[in-house]
Every structure is written in C-alpha cells, then in structure tokens.
C-alpha cells in the first residue's frame, strides 16, 4: 500500500514517528511531505527515517495556492472558524473567541454581532452561507497534479484543522480524485480549539473516548468513521530506562546531585497573554522563600518550549543557586534521552498547560499547576482541553490558586527517581492508553491506517450546481481582488512618490517660513538681549556670521545634510520638547555622541 502523509511542517510528524516506522517495517511505501519549512529539527528527523528505510521518501508538498483565490479562501475559512467559537460551549473560553475574531473578516464579525445578522439566520445562517460559498472555491491544480503523480492509496493529512487551514485544499483535491483520506489527530487540543471540519474524512484516528466524543459532538462526524487507538506519540516513554545515572545527569545539566530537583516545563501559550519568564521567576522566588526543609536548596530545572525561545532572550537566571535553564526539542535520540532523564530523575513536574504534563504522567511523576486568575482565564480553565487534566479518572494535576497554596502541596508530593504516582497512573489508563496500560497505541494506529487503505475508494466528487453557483458569485470578487493584488506594486510606488513630493513641498514651505522670520523678525531679535553667550556652531552659525570653513564637516553640502539641518533648525525653534533616543548601546557611550546636539539645543533652542 502507498501512503502519502502530508503535514503542515515536518515537526508535526514527530507525533507519528513510531507509526511511520512501524508502517515502513511492514513494507508499505510511504511518502512524507510538508507544506512549509521549520527550524525545530523535523526535517532532519524524517530524513533519518528515510535513510533507514528505502521504502520511505521525503518531499515538499505544493502548499497553498497563491493569488486572489487563496485570499478569498482564507477569508471564508477564517470567517467560518470565527462563527464556530460563537457557539455556547465556548462562552467560557474568551481567548479562543478573541483569537478567531482578530483573524476573521470584519464584515463577518459585524454581521454576527449586529441585528442585521438575524436577517440571514444569525450565526447558523451565516455559517450556512459561508459554507456554501466555500464549496465554490476552485480546487488547487498544483495539489491535484501532485496527487496524480504520487498515486497514493490513502492520504493522511495533519493537523488539517488549523484556524484558516490551507490544508483543506489538500483534502478537497483528494476527494475530487477519489482518494481515501485519513485525519490522524496529532494532539489533545486539536479537536476542541482549532477549526471545524468541513467534511468527513474516511477515517479520523483519535486517542481516547473523550476525543471520540469531541469528533462526534463538535464536528458532527459519523460514529463509524472515528477510530480510538490510544496516543501513539507517547508509546516511546513507556518502559524506557534512563540513559545515565542520576549523578551523571546532574553533572551534565549543572544541578546539585545531593538535592532533589523540580522540573518546570514551559508551555506554548496564547501570544500576548502571559509572560512566562516573569511567571517562572515569581514561582522560583516563592520556592526559595519557603522555610520547609524539604524545599531548602531544592534544584530547579527550567525546560523551555521550542516554539517560544525568543521570550527568554535577555532573561538572566544566574542569580538563583541550583537552577538551570536547559533542554532541546526531542526530535533526535540524544534530545529524547535528555528529556526522559529530566522527567525520570525529577521529584515533581510543574507548568501551566503543556503536553509535557501527559508525558510526565506516563513516567509516573506528580504534576502541578498553579491556576492564577490572569493566567488561567486564557490558557488553562479558558480552554476545553485543559479540563481533561482535571477530570479524567480523578484528574492528573495537583492544582493551587496561589503560590502560597502551591508550595506546601509541592513539598508534600516530592517523589524519588522513577515513577509510582497513583494519580498519574489512573490518568494514563483513561487518556493515553484506554485499552490498558500494557496495550501500546502504535499497533492499533497502524491497523487503523491499513484498514482505511482497504476501504472502497470514494467516488470522485464533482461540482454540484450549488458549488458552480457559488463559484460564479465568488468569481467577480476574486477578479477584483486579483486586480487589487496586481496593482499593489504600482500603488506602493505611487504612494511613495506622493509622500516624497509632500516632504519636499513641506521642506520648501519651512524654508520660506524660516527666511521670512530672518528677514522680517531678525532686526527685532537683535534688540533682545541674548540670555546665553555661545561660540560658533557647525550646524547653525549665529545670524549674520559666516560659517567658519575650518569647522565645516565633510558632506555638509549634501542634499540630505542640508535637509537635515533645516529640519533640526525648525525643530529647535519650536516650543515642543525634544526626545532623544532610543539608546541602542550603553547609555554613557550613546550620550557622548549626543552631547553636541544637546549643546546646540541649549544654545539655539527657541
């Protein structure tokens, strides 16, 4: 069987690494493709797999089509995704709704929240209208050609349901060619916090009964198309042993081997909601302020999230003893060993909202989260998937509402190396391996894909009359948008030319005003007693004096220099404050360069 596996980027495929390897070992021909590049090691991972198995190849997918139709598709899909988050079940998830609203077309947001929207049936009517319009979108010719060339028996697409996902074009192209399709759900939040499925793939592979219920209730999928397999991405942590001793691990990381340590796992939070470095520093201060002897001098290992390294630039944690900031994206053997060892030897795991909680549960560690109001409303209780960590089989997390409440809970839960936490074990049996802790998910996932490949090929989906009508309605919109896009360079050049012309006219006007002031007000100015006696200035000599040639700088007669002098002179004669900056280097050094300007401002200001 030939399997084409298309991911948004190659790092997504790390969630299916064990399944890809198992399918390859069973002799299936596998093509791994991605829509775009990434820098988290995913490409190297799939190339290592392809190097081991000659029946595995790697290539780039065509990605989204560009131009006017791509923009029309994006707007329609973002509008539909926004309408999804207006459903009552999302009333307590304000940031999910806000995120969708920020990306949606303004007209859709306005109609959905205005009385005029009721004329088309409110949210449901708008959804039906936009869905009908979406069916009129042309199918990507590049993707169809790619599928024709590959001739797969089944196409796997992940994640497929990103907000405004262009991968829906892949799905539509496969259906148009009569190719079997599978959505392998990659993560625990995809079905509840992403976009709505527009049509039903032949199979949707989920982890557990909770995700199956989401697929049925949130996406309206037929029950016979949803297959529960367990979470294959976590199989690699079951039964694993550390790669080194605890002493060697602590020496490698830089922690005191004589004290236990807590692992803080950073999260992929909603942008603009939480500054996690500041939160971590506050948490560290709370631990260090504790008088509990169990926490005295305890080690802290802060593990960054690979997608949010930028926010840690410039953060200095060196002032805290027995604390290290360490860890890489686990996409190769060494990084996986490091990650597992950090969990295995930790005494507890702490974080906000991350899949690392689930991995720590597999290892058997006590897991903690602090539900601070300013954090929880967007990133914890303000999401649907976080609630599984609180509820499944009694819940995984030990939660507190403040650092004062959290610190003694953490001290009480400290565990030795290895696993054994009962809350973690119960959660794993309900969420990760619903068929039993000893029943791996990867073989079930492989069986689901093989079964999908034996299904009768779906009929080729042609365009309905409604789709053609929608296309005819969208065509003039796309044509106008195409004209807008093609004229964009010309409009940009024209705008730039007009701005430059305006600036030249403004400069000329300012020169005339200055000359008028010198000619008509100079005599009156000479009668005023000067408050400050100053020497000559390279930039602005006193009225009536000639510039000293010896003080003339090279380039003074350049047009830009003359223009700058005029602007600075006018600025100096205004009554407004002058703000100097920004300081791009050490402030003292910067100030040395600005001293002549400050001296000039003092002498010639007003």
List the predicted regions and their residue ranges.
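Short N-terminal targeting/anchoring amphipathic segment
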Residues: 2-4, 90-98, 144-164, 346-351, ...
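Histidine-anchored nucleotide/phosphate-binding helix
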Residues: 10-25, 168-174, 283-288, 589-605
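Conserved N-terminal ligand/cofactor-binding loop architecture of enzyme catalytic domains
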Residues: 11, 25-144, 148-149, 475, ...
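A nucleotide-sugar donor-handling region in carbohydrate enzymes
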Residues: 128-136, 185, 200-276, 306, ...
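Donor nucleotide-activated moiety binding/catalytic core segment of transferases
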Residues: 147-148, 307-358, 363
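Catalytic binding pocket for nucleotide-activated donors in carbohydrate/polymer assembly enzymes
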Residues: 198-201, 221-223, 228, 355-434
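Conserved catalytic-core segment of nucleotide-activated headgroup transferases in glycan assembly
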Residues: 235-329, 592-594, 601
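C-terminal amphipathic helix plus adjacent low-complexity
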Residues: 242, 267-270, 298, 397-531
């Amino acid at each position: 069987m030939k399997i084409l596996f298309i991911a948004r980027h190659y790092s997504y495929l790390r969630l299916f690494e064990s399944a890809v390897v198992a399918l390859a070992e069973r002799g299936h021909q596998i093509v791994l493709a991605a829509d775009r590049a990434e820098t988290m090691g995913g490409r190297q991972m799939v190339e290592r797999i392809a190097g081991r198995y000659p029946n595995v190849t790697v290539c780039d997918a065509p990605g989204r089509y560009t131009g006017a139709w791509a923009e029309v598709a994006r707007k329609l899909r973002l509008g539909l995704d926004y309408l999804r988050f207006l459903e009552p079940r999302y009333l307590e998830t304000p940031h999910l709704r806000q995120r969708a609203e920020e990306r949606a077309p303004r007209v859709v947001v306005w109609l959905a929240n205005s009385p005029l929207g009721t004329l088309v049936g409110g949210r449901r009517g708008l959804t039906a209208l936009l869905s009908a319009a979406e069916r009129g979108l042309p199918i990507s010719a590049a993707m169809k050609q790619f599928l024709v060339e590959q001739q797969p028996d089944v196409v796997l697409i992940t994640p497929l349901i990103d907000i405004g996902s262009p991968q829906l074009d892949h799905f539509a192209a496969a259906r148009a060619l009569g190719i079997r399709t599978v959505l392998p759900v990659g993560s625990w939040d995809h079905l509840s916090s992403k976009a709505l499925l527009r049509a039903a793939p032949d199979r949707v592979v989920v982890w557990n009964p909770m995700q199956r219920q989401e697929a049925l209730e949130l996406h309206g999928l037929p029950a016979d198309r949803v297959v529960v397999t367990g979470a294959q991405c976590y199989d690699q942590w079951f039964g694993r042993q550390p790669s080194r001793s605890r002493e060697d691990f602590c020496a490698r990381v830089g922690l005191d081997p004589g004290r236990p340590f807590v692992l803080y796992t950073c999260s992929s939070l909603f942008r603009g909601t939480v500054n996690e470095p500041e939160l971590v520093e506050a948490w560290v201060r709370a631990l260090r302020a504790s008088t509990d002897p169990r926490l005295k001098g305890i080690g802290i290992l802060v593990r960054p999230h690979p997608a949010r390294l930028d926010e840690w630039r410039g953060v200095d944690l060196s002032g805290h003893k027995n604390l290290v900031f360490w860890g890489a994206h686990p996409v190769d053997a060494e990084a996986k060993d490091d990650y597992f060892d950090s969990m295995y030897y930790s005494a507890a795991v702490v974080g906000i909202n991350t899949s690392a909680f689930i991995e720590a549960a597999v290892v058997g560690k006590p897991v903690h989260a602090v539900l601070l109001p300013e954090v929880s409303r967007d990133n914890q209780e303000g999401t649907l998937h976080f609630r599984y960590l609180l509820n499944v089989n009694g819940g995984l997390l030990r939660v507190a509402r403040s650092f004062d409440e959290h610190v003694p809970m953490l001290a009480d839960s400290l565990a030795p190396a290895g696993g054994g936490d009962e809350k973690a074990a119960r959660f794993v049996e309900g969420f990760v391996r619903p068929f039993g802790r000893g029943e791996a998910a990867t073989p079930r996932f492989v069986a689901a894909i093989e079964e999908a490949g034996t299904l009768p090929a779906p009929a080729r989906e042609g365009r309905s009359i409604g789709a053609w009508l929608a296309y005819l309605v969208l065509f003039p919109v796309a044509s106008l948008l195409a004209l807008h896009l093609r004229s964009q360079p010309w409009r940009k050049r024209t705008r730039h030319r007009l701005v430059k012309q305006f600036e030249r006219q403004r400069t000329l006007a300012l020169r005339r005003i200055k000359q008028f002031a010198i000619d008509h007000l100079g005599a009156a100015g000479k009668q005023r007693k000067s408050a400050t006696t100053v020497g000559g200035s390279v930039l602005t000599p006193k009225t009536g004096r000639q510039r000293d040639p010896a003080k003339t700088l090279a380039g003074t007669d350049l047009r830009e220099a003359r223009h700058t002098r005029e602007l600075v002179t006018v600025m100096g004669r205004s009554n407004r404050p002058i703000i100097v900056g920004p300081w791009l280097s050490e402030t003292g050094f910067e100030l040395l360069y600005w001293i002549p300007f400050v001296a000039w401002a003092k002498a010639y200001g007003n």
